[in-house]
């Protein structure tokens, strides 16, 4: 059985969404299952449903834009986070931010203003940037067939709280090329941890924390996909701090080794000197 655009629109409505939300969607097209028209139909449904609000999809380029390949072109640089964002960024009416490694594409009346100024950021999720502002606008995050390991907003929480050992000490000199060809020099510190190169893989620990009472996330039905929709921390960052700290901090006696996402030291990041 293949799903249709009407099926997808109904599923979004059944989630309790109105279409007026500011919503950031992390997705896996494969997880949705067969859809008549494929990825284009999924995007048609999302753009129609959220036309009154603001639809945001990450169009990250961190896998390819770096010191060795420093030029990000907002019009042509392909994203590295899936087929839906890659097709979405090329659609008429969609605006893409100028962040060289963690750009976001948006569709809606507020897209231009919401995404403006990202060429001025110097970290992936700089406080005051697009990810951080989700909490200020009462935004939502929809995870379609992916886990919290792909929830970039958690990086934003860490940056707001100044969690140490999350960013490289030295910045890369990058360039963001705008739609008119003008270039902006950006000095960007990338995500980096010497003992744990795959920081986000431990973000799945937040699933249990955020589904505890009172729940911050809830499971939703969207065809064959596994979905979760957490509020973008509508509370102050300080409210999110103890949850993030307790969920991500390994036990002091823990000595795991080997494999992706493993902790190779008892404590591979230290929660101290953070700012509220």
Where does each model-flagged region fall?
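Glycine-rich phosphate/diphosphate-binding loops that line cofactor/substrate pockets in enzymes
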Residues: 12-22, 135-136
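N-terminal active-site beta-alpha-beta segment that forms phosphate/nucleotide-binding
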Residues: 18-68
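Short, flexible loop segments at boundaries between secondary-structure elements
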Residues: 52, 165-195
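N- or domain-start disorder-to-order transition segments that initiate the globular core
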Residues: 1-7
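Active-site beta-loop-alpha substructure in enzyme catalytic cores
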Residues: 140, 150, 155-179
């Amino acid at each position: 059985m293949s799903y249709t655009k009407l099926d997808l629109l109904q599923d979004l409505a059944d989630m309790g969404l109105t279409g007026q939300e500011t919503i950031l969607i992390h997705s896996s097209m494969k997880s949705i299952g067969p859809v008549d028209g494929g990825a284009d139909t999924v995007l048609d449904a999302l753009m129609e449903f959220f036309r009154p609000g603001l639809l945001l999809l990450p169009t990250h380029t961190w896998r390819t834009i770096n010191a060795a390949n420093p030029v990000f072109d907002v019009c042509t640089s392909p994203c590295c986070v899936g087929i839906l964002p890659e097709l979405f960024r090329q659609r008429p009416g969609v605006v893409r931010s100028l962040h060289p490694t963690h750009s976001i594409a948006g569709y809606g009346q507020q897209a231009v203003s919401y995404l403006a100024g990202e060429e001025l950021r110097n970290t992936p999720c700089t406080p005051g940037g697009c990810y951080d502002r989700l909490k200020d606008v009462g935004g939502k995050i929809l995870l379609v067939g992916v886990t919290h390991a792909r929830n970039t907003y958690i990086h934003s929480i860490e940056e707001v709280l100044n969690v140490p050992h999350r960013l490289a000490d030295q910045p890369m000199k990058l360039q963001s090329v705008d739609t008119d060809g003008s270039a902006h020099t950006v000095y960007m510190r990338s995500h980096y941890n010497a003992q744990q190169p795959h920081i986000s893989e431990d973000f799945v620990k937040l699933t249990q924390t955020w589904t505890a009472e009172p729940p911050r996330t809830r499971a939703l039905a969207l065809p064959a996909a596994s979905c979760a929709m957490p509020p973008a921390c509508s509370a102050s960052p300080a409210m999110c701090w103890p949850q993030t700290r307790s969920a991500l901090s390994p036990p002091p006696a823990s000595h795991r080794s080997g494999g992706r996402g493993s902790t190779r030291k008892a404590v591979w990041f230290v929660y101290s000197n953070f700012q509220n």
